[in-house]
Amino acid sequence: LDDFTSLHMIVVTARCNFNCRYCHASSANEKEQDLDLDWSTAKCIVNKIFESPSPIIKIEFQGGEPLLNWPIIKDIVEYAEIVNRIAKRRLEFVICTNLTLVTKDILEYCKSHNIAISTSLDGDQEIQNFNRKPRGLIDGYKVFEEKLALTRSILGQDGASPLLTVSKTNLNSLPLVVDEYIKHDFHGIFIRALNPYGNAVDNVNTLGYSTEEFLKAYKNALNYIIQKNIEGYHFIEYYAALLLERILTPFSTGFVDLQSPCGNIISGVIYDYNGYVYASDEGRMLARRGDKRFCLGHVKDNTWNELFKGDIAKEVVKASCVECLPECATCAYQLYCGADPVRYYAENGTFEGHRPSSSFCQKTKGALDYIFYLLSLNDDRINKVFWSWINY
């Protein structure tokens, strides 16, 4: 705990040039005003970040679409680098972007400052354009392909890492989604379920599915991915890889959902464009809909101790130790799992949650059940694939 917090997410704007059907962040139209991070607040955020005792500082730029406020990203990067001349931390940067606003100049800047790119890919052209709708008339998928090629030409083949969101649109075609990733020469996928925040709640009738449906699709996709590996194409399912690392090694993964106490605050924290600080990205998502239960304070009004060691922080940590939670305390999978008080709060209004009705609990148990089943087969081919994921 003395070395927390390493991941610092900064919302540089709440505006976006896309209107994704499941947008967890409830992003606003790109033409709206007063939703951008200003320099005065940004400087306070950077100063607060470097008060963290962690030897590693990762600053992740989020939105909205962060490239709509590109000047402030540059200001933060350059100021953080100046501060780090004295702080001497291992400093890393990531931009989470839909890629459409990426230019050669932006990518050259990213290359010179070692800024990584994270993006989103939900499937083929039809699925991508349905789930992730540009606010204009452009073909989002086509632009994604063009900008991915540009990104790789400057930052290298691994210059952009995609993230998948599973909705009803692609739930039953996950093997085809995997093929789409392979088509674009990616070597891994994180099969991530919808979360109960933002637009995903509004559109749950058209995008949602049961936990049982997700697990059925997940198992099918995992089998497909394993077979692809056996056939010679190295491709990781990152969620399974995280669970396997917990099961087969003595090491922690650093994945906030599989920590006890949870990674909220301890591992990662988010600073909104207006200077308010939240225990997690999901806490910020709730605040966009008016519920600021997980607000730790403001960078201009509160000290580091008030933010990170205040009552809310202590309450979140206290409620996320699986060793003390009902049912978790006696669960066979306790060693491999974690707790998510923000998710529990969103689902039923309490930090501790209710395990029998928790989709988080059901999903994690179901995934672990299947991974242990695959391990029990003692199939040399499958085991070889699993170890290749852990040692990657």
Task: Briefly describe each language-model feature range.
Residues 42-62, 69-196, 200-210:
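Radical SAM/AdoMet-radical enzyme domain recognition
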Residues 23-29, 157, 332-336:
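Detector for the c-type heme attachment site
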Residues 16, 20, 61, 275:
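Conserved, mostly hydrophobic/aromatic
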Residues 131-142, 149, 153-265, 270, ...:
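Radical SAM enzyme [4Fe-4S]-AdoMet core and its adjacent flexible, acidic
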